[in-house]
Amino acid sequence: MNNTKNKSDWQLFLEDYRFYHEKEFDWITYLNHCLNSYPDFDILKFIRKYGPECEKSFLSLQSKTKADVYGVFTKQIKAGSVNEVLAQKLVQLDALRTNYLIGALYSTNKTQKKLFKQSWKNAKKQGYTKQEWLMTLVGLPFEKGEYHKQLYAHSRQEILDLVEAVKKLYLRPEKDDKLEFADSSKVSESKSIKVTNAVTLPSDDLDKELFEFSGEGGDE
């Protein structure tokens, strides 16, 4: 205890954690506990509180997690346990979903903007948070009123890295510099599924929820 003054806040935190829990500090265990027990837990404030050493430790965890996720994903593909056609469609549909949300949020169509605004008002009256309302519009599963930790599971850079990983595994550059999905189910190399010609997602599927919230979709 005599050396307390010479130790950083992060070192003292780790010692206290070890003493109280009788085991070494583990980021995954700690974050899961905090996110489940304290909905207002802010990892950025936590890192700022305990300084550069804490930040370095957390960034090390992020790098390892990203490498682990990429490694598992790559092994599954090489082992043939991931259906390539399904993976292609999921990537395409997720891009369509993102485009839909951006278009809806920043629409230049006056009618669409009015509908969107009314949709949020009615969703709010029904007890939905803005996050839950947006998740409903794009068909993401969630439990109403719960803390949606899945929204904070990955950083922007991690998501972009995973997108690049999928591109490298599934896409090939064509002569016109456009990326196409490599179609392993076809014998001919000239056959491929173009990203720009991806199967379209019927707008009614997503707009249904928008109209229901806006009061245009029925009695509920």
From Swiss-Prot:
Top-level taxon in the UniProt lineage: Bacteria
InterPro entries with a match to the protein in the record: DUF5454
Name of this chain's protein: Uncharacterized protein MG210.1 homolog
